[in-house]
Amino acid sequence: MALNIENIVAELENATILELSELVKAIEEKFDVTAAAPVAAAAGAGDAAAAKDSFDVELTSAGDKKVAVIKEVRGITGLGLKEAKELVDGAPTMIKEGLSESEANEVKEKLEAAGASITLK
């Protein structure tokens, strides 16, 4: 059985975000690696934090209003009901990655208004 890159790419194109997230976790566990980008060695931690231009929105808890949070996650991510529910049920989990500060704060405000606990990273 030959490894066909085109077939793998085609399968990945059809996968949901939740399935891709599970794939990344499985690869990390199997090969004992992380998907995090390499960090520049001793470039000055204070400078790196001040120059941060990309933010990730992490759902830490759905809170008491889980249905409202699921609806908001669907609106933000474009996921279907089942995928959004699985994402919320799997908290803590990333909702959106690579956002600007203003976009991340906007998503955070929407989810917190729905009753969720959010962390920006």
UniProtKB/Swiss-Prot annotation:
Gene encoding the protein: rplL
Subunit structure: Homodimer. Part of the ribosomal stalk of the 50S ribosomal subunit. Forms a multimeric L10(L12)X complex, where L10 forms an elongated spine to which 2 to 4 L12 dimers bind in a sequential fashion. Binds GTP-bound translation factors.
Gene Ontology terms for molecular function: mRNA binding; structural constituent of ribosome
Assigned keywords, A-Z: Ribonucleoprotein, Ribosomal protein
GO annotation, cellular component aspect: cytosolic large ribosomal subunit
SUPFAM superfamilies: ClpS-like, Ribosomal protein L7/12, oligomerisation (N-terminal) domain
Function comment: Forms part of the ribosomal stalk which helps the ribosome interact with GTP-bound translation factors. Is thus essential for accurate translation.
HAMAP family: Ribosomal_bL12 (MF_00368)
Pfam families found in the cross-reference section: Ribosomal_L12 (PF00542), Ribosomal_L12_N (PF16320)
Protein name as it appears in the record: Large ribosomal subunit protein bL12
Keyword Ribonucleoprotein: yes
Originating organism: Lactococcus lactis subsp. lactis (strain IL1403)
Similarity remark: Belongs to the bacterial ribosomal protein bL12 family.
One of the protein's GO biological processes: translation
